[in-house]
Curated annotation (Swiss-Prot):
Extracellular side: 60-605
Protein name: Cadherin-15
Native organism: Mus musculus
Signal peptide span: 1-21
Glycosylation site residues: 106, 226, 530, 537, 575
Domain Cadherin: 60-151, 152-259, 260-374, 375-480, 481-589
Gene giving rise to this polypeptide: Cdh15
Compartments in which it is found: Cell membrane
Ranges that cross the membrane: 606-625
Spans annotated as Disordered: 676-700
InterPro entries: Cadherin, Cadherin-like_dom, Cadherin-like_sf, Cadherin_CS, Cadherin_Y-type_LIR, Catenin-bd_sf
Length: 784
């Protein structure tokens, strides 16, 4: 360059020991700033190496370096610096003397925040013109060991199986140091300060890995190990920090379960199941609740019928002996069981064998009162339909399992819905006590079910329940009959028409019903000569003519027989009308009339029809009379003045004397047959005012008249209620003002029965002839 900066690194602090030398020029890096001091020679500016300064410097301000320019004399150059630490954040860390070029440190440095600063230096003349090109000034912060190492966790956790071999990895401890990792200030070393005795674990000082160093880890001895860890910088000679490591020992099945006794004694009641009779205690040193601890029990011998089982109590790990099949004291009084115990998890091969891996269990059976037992339950038997009372059904006896107690058994009924059976209380013999109806609702598919009880005489007694199922055998007690109607018609020509189809029914069930056999009565020889019956199927036959017979009604005697054992036979009369037929095989119209008159309606049938007609007419008449009587009674209850009560020469009059202003009465026909109200000459159709109503009275709205006689009572009740609730009418308990009606009265005063216009000894004995309703009057006024 034309002119070079003469950088004088005036070491104000002798401790740094820095000396600056002008490097020899190198042609390969020559810049075109020349200064002709000699032919063929160029001078270059100083190359300034990084300036190092320690962090945490206490003496401030502290001189770092001095820069100078050789272009002008001292005092004619102004120096300045720019960059981070000067006019950029962090500000005011560095400053420069503008006349001397000395650079000062003004604040304490922290390498962990900023490890170097890059500044720009400027040289100007007094007029502010640039004398030299700007040059770079780099300041490097030298690290000090001012940060302790730190573990990433306060507590490190690891797990390892007991019995692990040496060198087994457990966990890894990790730590950091904020100092310069390129220096010993961040060179960390790990160690174990404390772990107890014996020492089963070691830590790699460089990586922090924790591993086992010897055998002998036993969870049953020590389940958890607590280690104190340390990390130090300066390769172990500097600052330190500590943390903890918790190592849990996982369980393996290295301990076999053992019984606490060589023999257990228990008692069990007979004839019960699903009950616990005792517990088998075991010990296991492995982790409670784990598969290495949970016990499983096996009955090796002594229970060939599988009457016992052993399950494990999950809380106590005890074996619970339970009875799954009822025991019988009379069959066996004692059981000797041999039981073994193992864990759910298999035992480790290196584990020692248990001394009490098996035990004996003695179970004594207690004798109890057992209920009687029916050898055959349910008991099925059969009896003929319609069996008479006293017919033996079965003997439903039970036996007592308690052979040593010599108990007596009694029998009774528990369920016999038809009360059909009778049970001998001592023997259990069952017989009928009446005839069972075939239509009983308790017969299901021909079976009748009853429940019998057997009771011993123990205290308290025991009861057994037995079911008796009785099949009611069908008996052929009904003969077949022709299906209705037992009549029909045939063409007079034998070859005409399809014939007459005959059907039969039977109230008996199979096999006492169909097939049915149809036969003309052999006792009437003429039937076989003129008529024939051919079987169609098991329940129907066809009747035909062999020869032409006279037209009209013919009565044929038929024999019907079923297939029961023994068979039942019925003789039945068949009414057959023979008529002339057309080409289609049906009776001609004239013949049909003849046939209709002789279908075979008997005199009894005609009487029934006529009687039914008469009964129907009588019922209709009674219904009409009852309707009229009810209407008349209803009218009497509402309008007492309309009754016409005639008692010989005594008449009932409604005359109440003269002087009444209101001469208009209700028309009952209008009540029974209301019509629409017609408009009158009164304005707005208002009704006439009552004479006893105040002048401010406002008539009530028109009420709708009843539409049927049955509503008359409601109509009158509504009118009474309207009058009672009328606020414009004075109340009944106040004095009313009536218009003057004049003196005297056309009608005289009412006289008593004793006051007579004739002689005083009038005879009232005729009142006795009027019936019980006048008996009281006859006693009062008749001759004594």
């Amino acid at each position: 360059m034309g002119s070079a900066l003469l950088l004088a690194l005036g070491l104000l602090a002798q401790s740094l020991g820095l000396s600056w030398a002008v490097p020899e020029p190198k042609p390969s890096t020559l810049y075109p700033w020349r200064r002709a001091s000699a032919p063929g020679r160029v001078r270059r500016a100083w190359v300034i190496p990084p300036i190092s300064v320690s962090e945490n410097h206490k003496r401030l301000p502290y001189p770092l370096v001095q820069i100078k320019s050789d272009k002008q004399q001292l005092g004619s150059v102004i120096y300045s610096i720019q960059g981070p630490g000067v006019d950029e954040e962090p500000r005011n860390v560095f400053s420069i003397d503008k006349f001397t070029g000395r650079v000062y440190l003004n604040a304490t440095l922290d390498r962990e925040k900023t490890d170097r600063f890059r500044l720009r230096a400027f040289a100007l003349d007094l007029g502010g013109s640039t004398l030299e090109d700007p040059t770079d000034l780099e300041i490097v912060v030298v690290d000090q060991n001012d940060n302790r190492p730190a573990f990433l966790q306060d507590v490190f956790r690891g797990r390892i199986l007991e019995g692990a071999i040496p060198g087994t990895f457990v966990t890894r401890a990790e730590a950091t140091d904020a100092d310069d990792p390129e220096t010993d200030n961040a060179a960390l070393r790990f160690s174990i300060l404390e772990q107890g005795s014996p020492e089963f674990f070691s830590i790699d000082e460089h990586t922090g890995e924790i591993r086992t160093v010897q055998v002998g880890l036993d969870r049953e001895v020590v389940a958890v190990y607590n280690l104190t860890l340390q990390v130090a910088d300066m390769s172990g000679d500097g600052l330190t920090a500590t943390a903890s490591a918790i190592i849990s020992i996982d369980d393996i099945n290295d301990n076999a379960p053992e019984f606490t006794k060589d023999e257990f004694f228990m008692e069990a009641a007979e004839a019960v199941s699903g009950v616990d009779v005792g517990r088998l205690e075991v010990e296991d040193k492995d982790l409670p609740g784990s598969p290495n601890w949970v016990a499983r029990f096996t009955i090796l011998e002594g229970d060939p019928d599988g009457q016992f089982k052993i399950y494990t109590d999950p809380k106590t790990n005890e074996g619970v002996l339970s009875v799954v099949k009822p025991l019988d004291y009379e069959s066996r009084e004692q059981y000797e069981l041999r039981v073994s115990v193992q864990n759910e998890a298999p035992l480790q091969a290196a584990a020692p064998r248990a001394r009490r891996g098996q035990t004996r269990v003695s179970v004594w059976v207690q004798d109890t009162n057992e209920a009687p037992v029916f050898p055959e339950n349910p008991l099925r038997t059969s009896i003929a339909e319609g069996a008479p009372p006293g017919t033996s059904v079965a003997t439903f006896s039970a036996r007592d399992p308690d052979t040593e107690q010599l108990q007596r058994i009694s029998y009774s009924k528990d369920y016999d819905p038809e009360d059909w059976l009778q049970v001998d209380g001592a023997t259990g013999r069952i017989q009928t006590q009446r005839v069972l109806s075939p239509a009983s609702p308790f017969l299901k598919d021909g079976w009748y079910r009853a429940i019998i009880l057997a009771l011993d005489n123990a205290i308290p007694p025991s009861t057994a329940t037995g079911t008796l199922s009785i099949e009611i055998l069908e008996v052929n007690d009904h003969a077949p009959a022709l299906a209705l109607p037992p009549s029909g018609s045939l063409c007079s020509e034998p070859d005409q028409g399809p014939g007459l189809l005959l059907g039969a029914t039977d109230e008996d069930l199979p096999p006492h019903g169909a097939p049915f056999h149809f036969q003309l009565n052999p006792r009437v020889p003429d039937l076989g000569r003129n008529w024939s019956v051919s079987q169609i199927n098991v329940s129907h036959a066809r009747l035909r003519l062999r020869h032409q017979v006279s037209e009209g009604l013919h009565r044929l005697s038929l024999l019907l027989q079923d297939s029961g054992e023994p068979p039942q036979q019925r003789e039945q009369t068949l009414n057959v009308t023979v008529c002339r037929c057309g080409s289609d095989g049906t009776c001609l119209p004239g013949a049909a009339a003849l046939r209709g008159g002789g279908v075979g309606v008997s005199l009894g049938a005609l009487v029934i029809v006529l009687a039914s007609t008469v009964v129907l007419l009588v019922l209709i008449l009674l219904a009409a009379l009852r309707t009229r009587f009810r209407g008349h009674s209803r009218g009497k209850s509402l309008l007492h003045g309309l009754q016409e009560d005639l008692r010989d020469n005594i008449l009932n009059y409604d005359e109440q004397g003269g002087g009444e202003e209101d001469q208009d009465a209700y028309d009952i026909n209008q009540l029974r047959h209301p019509v629409e109200p017609r408009a009158t000459s009164r304005s707005l159709g208002r009704p006439p005012l009552r004479r006893d109503a105040p002048f401010s009275y406002v008539p009530q709205p028109h009420r709708v008249l009843p539409t049927s006689p049955s509503d008359i009572a409601n109509f009158i009740s509504d009118g009474l209620e309207a009058a009672d609730s009328d606020p414009s009418v004075p109340p009944y308990d106040t004095a009313l003002i009536y218009d003057y009606e004049g003196d005297g009265s056309v009608a005289g005063t009412l006289s008593s029965i004793l006051s007579s216009l004739g002689d005083e000894d009038q005879d009232y004995d005729y009142l006795r002839d009027w019936g019980p309703r006048f008996a009281r009057l006859a006693d009062m006024y008749g001759h004594q």
